[in-house]
Amino acid sequence: KPSKNVQSIARKKRYELLFRKCDKYKIKYILLGHHQDDLFENFFIRILRGSGLKGLISLDKKNKIGDKNLLRPLLDEKKENLIFISKNVFNFYIEDPTNKDEKYKRIMIRGLIKKLQEDGLDKKKFLKTINNLKFSNKVVDYYVDENLKKNTFISNNNSRLILNNIFFLQPYEVIFRSLSESIKMIGKKYYAARGKKIDKIINHLKKSVSYRSTLGGCIIEKVNETVIISREQ
């Protein structure tokens, strides 16, 4: 039993179970019950983790992990309204006891947001800020796609990806996301590798003439000005 990050680990396990069922029954779409309060909580949690732009706005109405489409149709709805509907329309509502346990970071964040609201936090303006960040994120995604299209070459059997030297001449965030996507694709993983590990690899690739490391089920190797990402056997 884990002693740290219990809710985060539990969430990851839930997704893994969902994905396995989806694979079994060939399901490509998953509807999730995240609401507006989850959106705000996720933003603050990501700030505490030191997340970048993509992490801050990671909870969206449509996300894709591998070949699975995650849809959140209730993301504009307030939690209090959904609870009201559950109790008064469906006559069915279950309270999760961990929602009141302040040893969990999410519950502490929930209390912080409530306090900020009492001190004048305007949720409409907060939501506008998140939406503005989403527009900025789309711009970065465009340049990531361009970097992957123009500066990577994949082998015939899709087991190796070759990155040219121009790949690493882009702005850092573009390099970071491009490399993260490359490792996830070749390693055939649902989730990207941890940011700190990718940062470390980028630093070595930029400074070293030759370099070899493993991450996310991949071997990352630099030979002169070329980087080769291949799947671990």
Question: Predicted regions span which residues?
Answer:
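Core alpha/beta nucleotide-donor-binding catalytic domains of modification enzymes
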Residues: K1-L112
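AMP-forming adenylation/ATP pyrophosphatase catalytic core
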Residues: K13, N63-D67, I107, G111, ...
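Catalytic-core segments of class I nucleotidyltransferases/pyrophosphorylases
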Residues: D122
